[in-house]
Amino acid sequence: GRWVEAVSEMAAFADAGAVPGEVTVDISAGRLLPPITAPGKRIYAAANYGDHIREMLNAGTARNDAERDDMLDRDKTRVRPYSFLKAPSALSGAHDDIILPSDSTKVDWEVELAMVVSRRTKRIAAENAMDCIAGFMTTNDVSARDWNMREDWVTLRTDWFGGKSHDTFAPVS
């Protein structure tokens, strides 16, 4: 779509010599917006970093070290990632304030690598995946961890949307 066209236009602009060798911009008087202000959807992959999984299990999911190690071993055999979405209102700029919910005492964050998909695609073969990648950004996955676990819903237990989709909980740069 438009992303591919814009990248081509920027490359042509640069190739034509229209950009001086060094360009500087004073950003102190402005606000850095997210590089993509209205993404179609943002899919996050949870539990993709071993040390963080271990940290979270030690923080309360596992009752002891043996149970934690058993959970980690079981997770290694999974093929499909545990995915979740964030609300559009969670998107914010890299230097915007993160608004903390007044009734949460366990706000936490993780730095993540965000991949920008350049066009609509479904079930693409792994060997063709990079053909659909426009680039990469950094983001923070901010969570109200005390909202993620739902003791009032014993059968479901988790509400990741409620814990991770507060306004400003997805700053991007």
Task: Go through each PLM region and give its residues.
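Ligand-binding beta-strand-loop-alpha-helix segment within the catalytic cores
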Residues: 86, 96, 111-113
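Flexible glycine-rich active-site/ligand-binding loops centered on an Asp-His dyad
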Residues: 66, 79, 85-86, 128-154
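Functionally critical, mid-to-C-terminal surface segments that flank or help form catalytic/ligand
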Residues: 160-173
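N-terminal non-catalytic cap/leader segment that marks the start of a structured domain
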Residues: 1-82, 104
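Residues embedded in well-ordered beta-strands
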Residues: 112-116, 137
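Solvent-exposed alpha-helices and their adjacent loops that cap or buttress functional pockets
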Residues: 34-38, 73-77, 83, 90-92, ...
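Active-site glycine-rich loop that binds ribose-phosphate moieties when present
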Residues: 91-103, 117-123
